[in-house]
């Protein structure tokens, strides 16, 4: 059963989905995939499953286990997950953490569901979720912007927008595939590409500058996203 107040035209035309129908009396898993500001409203519609053996699996950023236990009861099984958008092409990475009532079987069932769209990792504690959100949850947007910026830089050097974008996209996709398929660390892959006195070294001298390079900038980026995640969790 799928509850969606504003279903898309595509969703309306999928016959296999039971859309906005009466909920069953029992449910093995309830997946919560709504915006954080709408979460409490959504939870009121599924209170019948609270304090039962139903697993509440949330993929909403900033919605804490404490909040779910407050709304659903201390005897509810809560698993919080942070997926990312590459899940839409089965290349996602999802981190999960459960509350004290969560069993190994509950985690395995949730992992089996989430593994359908990529990889799943378990966290040691919920505090890690803010950093996870900043790295893998928001991370795809950083990469997309890198592609944009690389393509714009190519245009500035005289390439056509189409050619520069194709080169940039293929380069990021290829580099990502290489990191996935090789046993070498990204740092070694970087060294493999870098010839002494060559073009890559000239570029890396700027990117790897301790003060104005990419590393300090990325630290600021991840810190900002982590702080925002913590702020959302307190609302």
Q: What do the PLM-derived regions correspond to, one by one?
A:
Residues 1-5:
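Conserved acidic E/D residue at the C-terminus of a beta-strand in Rossmann-like folds
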Residues 7-12, 17-96, 100:
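Rossmann-like NAD(P)(H) cofactor-binding subdomain of soluble oxidoreductases
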Residues 27, 39, 43, 65, ...:
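A general structural signal for well-ordered alpha-helical segments in protein cores
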Residues 39, 160-167, 189, 200:
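Small-residue helix-packing motif on alpha-helices
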Residues 67-77, 93-131, 142-181, 226-228:
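Internal alpha-helical scaffold of NAD(P)-dependent oxidoreductase catalytic cores
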Residues 128-134, 186-191:
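Short pre-catalytic strand/loop immediately N-terminal to key active-site residues, enriched for Gly-Thr
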Residues 169-235:
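NAD(P)-dependent Rossmann-like dehydrogenase/reductase catalytic/cofactor-binding core
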């Amino acid at each position: 059963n799928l509850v969606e107040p504003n279903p898309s035209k595509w969703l309306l035309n999928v016959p296999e989905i039971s859309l906005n129908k009466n909920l069953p009396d029992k449910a093995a898993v309830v997946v919560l995939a709504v915006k954080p500001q709408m979460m409490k409203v959504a939870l009121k519609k599924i209170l019948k499953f609270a304090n039962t053996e139903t697993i509440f699996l949330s993929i909403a950023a900033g919605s804490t286990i404490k909040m779910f236990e407050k709304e659903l009861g201390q005897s509810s099984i809560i698993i919080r997950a942070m997926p990312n958008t590459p899940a839409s092409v089965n290349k996602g990475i999802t981190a999960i953490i459960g509350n004290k009532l969560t069993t190994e079987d509950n985690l395995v069932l949730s992992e089996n569901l989430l593994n359908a769209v990529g990889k799943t990792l378990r966290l040691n504690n919920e505090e890690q979720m803010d950093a996870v959100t900043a790295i893998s949850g928001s991370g795809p947007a950083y990469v997309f912007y890198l592609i944009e910026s690389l393509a714009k830089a190519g245009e500035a050097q005289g390439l056509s927008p189409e050619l520069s974008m194709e080169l940039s996209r293929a380069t990021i996709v290829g580099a990502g595939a290489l990191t996935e398929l090789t046993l070498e660390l990204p740092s070694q892959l970087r060294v493999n590409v870098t010839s002494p006195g060559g073009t890559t070294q000239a570029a890396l001298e700027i990117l790897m500058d301790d003060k104005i390079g990419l590393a300090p900038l990325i630290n600021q980026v991840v810190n900002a996203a982590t702080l925002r995640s913590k702020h959302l969790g307190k609302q």
